[in-house]
Protein backbone atom coordinates (compact mmCIF):
# COMPACT_ATOMS: atom_id res chain seq x y z
CA UNK A 1 0.00 0.00 0.00
CA UNK A 2 1.32 3.44 -0.91
CA UNK A 3 1.46 6.34 1.51
CA UNK A 4 -1.56 8.68 1.35
CA UNK A 5 0.68 11.53 0.22
CA UNK A 6 1.68 9.47 -2.83
CA UNK A 7 -1.83 8.20 -3.53
CA UNK A 8 -3.05 11.80 -3.56
CA UNK A 9 -0.81 12.47 -6.57
CA UNK A 10 -2.71 9.93 -8.65
CA UNK A 11 -5.57 11.68 -10.42
CA UNK A 12 -7.98 8.79 -10.80
CA UNK A 13 -8.30 5.31 -9.36
CA UNK A 14 -10.31 2.41 -10.72
CA UNK A 15 -11.20 -0.94 -9.22
CA UNK A 16 -10.66 -3.85 -11.58
CA UNK A 17 -12.64 -6.96 -10.75
CA UNK A 18 -13.16 -10.30 -12.43
CA UNK A 19 -16.52 -10.32 -14.23
CA UNK A 20 -19.19 -12.33 -12.42
CA UNK A 21 -21.38 -12.91 -15.49
CA UNK A 22 -20.40 -16.24 -17.05
CA UNK A 23 -21.01 -15.10 -20.64
CA UNK A 24 -18.77 -12.08 -20.12
CA UNK A 25 -16.04 -14.29 -18.68
CA UNK A 26 -16.25 -16.63 -21.67
CA UNK A 27 -16.13 -13.68 -24.09
CA UNK A 28 -13.00 -12.32 -22.39
CA UNK A 29 -11.27 -15.69 -22.61
CA UNK A 30 -12.28 -16.08 -26.28
CA UNK A 31 -10.93 -12.64 -27.16
CA UNK A 32 -7.68 -13.23 -25.32
CA UNK A 33 -7.27 -16.57 -27.07
CA UNK A 34 -7.99 -14.96 -30.45
CA UNK A 35 -5.31 -12.34 -29.77
CA UNK A 36 -2.77 -14.95 -28.66
CA UNK A 37 -3.34 -17.06 -31.78
CA UNK A 38 -3.36 -14.18 -34.30
CA UNK A 39 -2.40 -10.75 -32.91
CA UNK A 40 -2.46 -9.02 -36.31
CA UNK A 41 -5.81 -10.52 -37.25
CA UNK A 42 -7.24 -9.53 -33.88
CA UNK A 43 -6.00 -5.95 -34.31
CA UNK A 44 -7.54 -5.84 -37.80
CA UNK A 45 -10.84 -7.14 -36.44
CA UNK A 46 -10.98 -4.33 -33.87
CA UNK A 47 -9.46 -1.63 -36.08
CA UNK A 48 -12.75 0.07 -36.96
CA UNK A 49 -13.92 0.22 -33.33
CA UNK A 50 -10.51 1.56 -32.25
CA UNK A 51 -10.61 4.22 -34.98
CA UNK A 52 -14.08 5.36 -33.86
CA UNK A 53 -12.93 5.57 -30.25
CA UNK A 54 -9.80 7.48 -31.26
CA UNK A 55 -11.92 9.98 -33.22
CA UNK A 56 -14.27 10.41 -30.25
CA UNK A 57 -11.32 11.11 -27.95
CA UNK A 58 -9.79 13.62 -30.39
CA UNK A 59 -13.14 15.40 -30.69
CA UNK A 60 -13.38 15.58 -26.89
CA UNK A 61 -9.84 16.98 -26.66
CA UNK A 62 -10.78 19.76 -29.07
CA UNK A 63 -13.98 20.66 -27.23
CA UNK A 64 -12.77 20.40 -23.64
CA UNK A 65 -11.47 23.97 -23.45
CA UNK A 66 -14.90 25.33 -24.42
CA UNK A 67 -16.67 23.65 -21.49
CA UNK A 68 -17.15 25.96 -18.54
CA UNK A 69 -17.57 24.45 -15.09
CA UNK A 70 -20.52 26.28 -13.51
CA UNK A 71 -20.09 27.71 -10.02
CA UNK A 72 -22.79 25.45 -8.59
CA UNK A 73 -20.80 22.43 -9.78
CA UNK A 74 -17.60 23.83 -8.23
CA UNK A 75 -19.51 24.27 -4.97
CA UNK A 76 -20.74 20.69 -5.24
CA UNK A 77 -17.14 19.48 -5.74
CA UNK A 78 -16.01 21.42 -2.68
CA UNK A 79 -18.92 20.20 -0.53
CA UNK A 80 -18.28 16.56 -1.38
CA UNK A 81 -14.52 16.81 -0.83
CA UNK A 82 -15.04 18.66 2.45
CA UNK A 83 -17.58 16.09 3.65
CA UNK A 84 -15.15 13.27 2.83
CA UNK A 85 -12.33 15.04 4.69
CA UNK A 86 -9.88 15.16 1.79
CA UNK A 87 -6.67 17.07 2.45
CA UNK A 88 -5.66 20.05 0.34
CA UNK A 89 -7.34 21.08 -2.90
CA UNK A 90 -5.98 18.43 -5.24
CA UNK A 91 -9.19 16.41 -4.89
CA UNK A 92 -11.37 19.33 -6.00
CA UNK A 93 -9.05 20.16 -8.89
CA UNK A 94 -8.93 16.56 -10.08
CA UNK A 95 -12.68 16.15 -9.70
CA UNK A 96 -13.32 19.34 -11.70
CA UNK A 97 -10.87 18.43 -14.48
CA UNK A 98 -12.02 14.83 -14.79
CA UNK A 99 -15.69 15.86 -14.77
CA UNK A 100 -14.98 18.33 -17.57
CA UNK A 101 -13.12 15.66 -19.56
CA UNK A 102 -15.95 13.16 -19.09
CA UNK A 103 -18.52 15.71 -20.22
CA UNK A 104 -16.41 16.44 -23.32
CA UNK A 105 -16.11 12.72 -24.05
CA UNK A 106 -19.88 12.39 -23.62
CA UNK A 107 -20.32 15.04 -26.31
CA UNK A 108 -22.41 17.38 -24.19
CA UNK A 109 -22.25 21.16 -24.23
CA UNK A 110 -22.90 21.59 -20.48
CA UNK A 111 -21.34 19.92 -17.47
CA UNK A 112 -23.86 18.68 -14.92
CA UNK A 113 -24.19 16.74 -11.67
CA UNK A 114 -24.59 13.45 -13.53
CA UNK A 115 -21.05 13.84 -14.89
CA UNK A 116 -19.79 14.69 -11.38
CA UNK A 117 -21.55 11.68 -9.82
CA UNK A 118 -20.00 9.35 -12.40
CA UNK A 119 -16.46 10.66 -11.92
CA UNK A 120 -16.42 11.26 -8.15
CA UNK A 121 -15.70 7.66 -7.06
CA UNK A 122 -12.71 7.44 -9.41
CA UNK A 123 -11.35 10.82 -8.32
CA UNK A 124 -11.93 10.43 -4.58
CA UNK A 125 -11.91 6.79 -3.42
CA UNK A 126 -8.12 6.60 -3.06
CA UNK A 127 -8.02 9.88 -1.11
CA UNK A 128 -10.17 8.68 1.80
CA UNK A 129 -8.82 8.09 5.26
CA UNK A 130 -9.33 4.57 6.55
CA UNK A 131 -12.14 4.36 9.08
CA UNK A 132 -11.85 1.27 11.30
CA UNK A 133 -15.50 1.67 12.35
CA UNK A 134 -16.77 1.69 8.75
CA UNK A 135 -16.11 -1.52 6.85
CA UNK A 136 -17.82 -0.39 3.66
CA UNK A 137 -15.61 0.00 0.62
CA UNK A 138 -14.30 3.37 -0.49
CA UNK A 139 -16.50 3.38 -3.61
CA UNK A 140 -19.59 2.93 -1.44
CA UNK A 141 -18.42 5.64 0.98
CA UNK A 142 -18.08 8.12 -1.89
CA UNK A 143 -21.50 7.13 -3.27
CA UNK A 144 -23.07 7.52 0.17
CA UNK A 145 -21.47 10.94 0.59
CA UNK A 146 -22.72 12.06 -2.84
CA UNK A 147 -26.24 11.05 -1.84
CA UNK A 148 -26.03 12.78 1.54
CA UNK A 149 -24.45 16.00 0.27
CA UNK A 150 -26.04 16.39 -3.16
CA UNK A 151 -29.28 14.48 -2.66
PLM features per residue range, with description:
Residues 1-2:
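Short, small-residue-biased leader/transition segments that mark boundaries at the very start
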Residues 5-20:
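A short helix-turn-beta junction within AAA+ P-loop NTPase domains corresponding to the substrate/partner-engaging
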Residues 8, 93-97:
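Short alpha-helical basic/polar micro-motif
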Residues 9, 27-66, 80-83:
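Conserved AAA+ ATPase "sensor/coupling" helix adjacent to the nucleotide-binding pocket
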Residues 10, 77, 99:
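Conserved RecA-like P-loop NTPase ATPase core
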Residues 17-26, 32-34, 123:
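Conserved nucleotide-binding/hydrolysis micro-motifs of P-loop NTPases
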Residues 66-77:
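Acidic catalytic patch
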Residues 78-90, 101-151:
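C-terminal engagement/docking regions of AAA+ P-loop ATPases
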